């Protein structure tokens, strides 16, 4: 489990990215790089770190499900992830 402060910081940063997304797109189309530099650097979607949506864990992130490998395993064993089956080869 990540610290509460890290989870809150990540949520605030995602809100900031959404807030400036439209403006960033317009400025990029116009090639107004001076205007882009006036926008906060944290508003860039490149700076986002993928975190587990359940507990905020930053590592072992599975993009398709938006959770970490640990939570993926727990939910898969409980049968709470549709379309996921245990396999062996």
Curated annotation (Swiss-Prot):
GO molecular function, one term: structural constituent of ribosome
Keywords: Ribonucleoprotein, Ribosomal protein, RNA-binding, rRNA-binding
Biological processes per GO annotation: translation
One annotated Gene Ontology cellular component of this protein: small ribosomal subunit
Entry superkingdom: Bacteria
HAMAP family the record matches: Ribosomal_uS14_1
PANTHER family: 30S RIBOSOMAL PROTEIN S14, SMALL RIBOSOMAL SUBUNIT PROTEIN US14M
Oligomeric form and interacting partners: Part of the 30S ribosomal subunit. Contacts proteins S3 and S10.
Family: Belongs to the universal ribosomal protein uS14 family.
Role description: Binds 16S rRNA, required for the assembly of 30S particles and may also be responsible for determining the conformation of the 16S rRNA at the A site.
Identification of the protein by name: Small ribosomal subunit protein uS14
Organism: Onion yellows phytoplasma (strain OY-M)
């Amino acid at each position: 489990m990540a610290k509460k402060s890290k989870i809150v910081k990540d949520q605030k940063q995602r809100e900031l990215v959404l807030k400036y997304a439209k403006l960033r797109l317009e400025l990029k189309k116009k090639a107004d790089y001076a205007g882009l530099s006036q926008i906060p650097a944290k508003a860039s979607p490149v700076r986002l770190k993928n975190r587990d949506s359940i507990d905020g864990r930053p590592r072992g992130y599975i993009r398709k499900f938006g959770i970490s490998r640990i939570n993926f395993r727990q939910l898969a064993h409980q049968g709470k992830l549709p379309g996921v089956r245990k396999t062996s080869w």
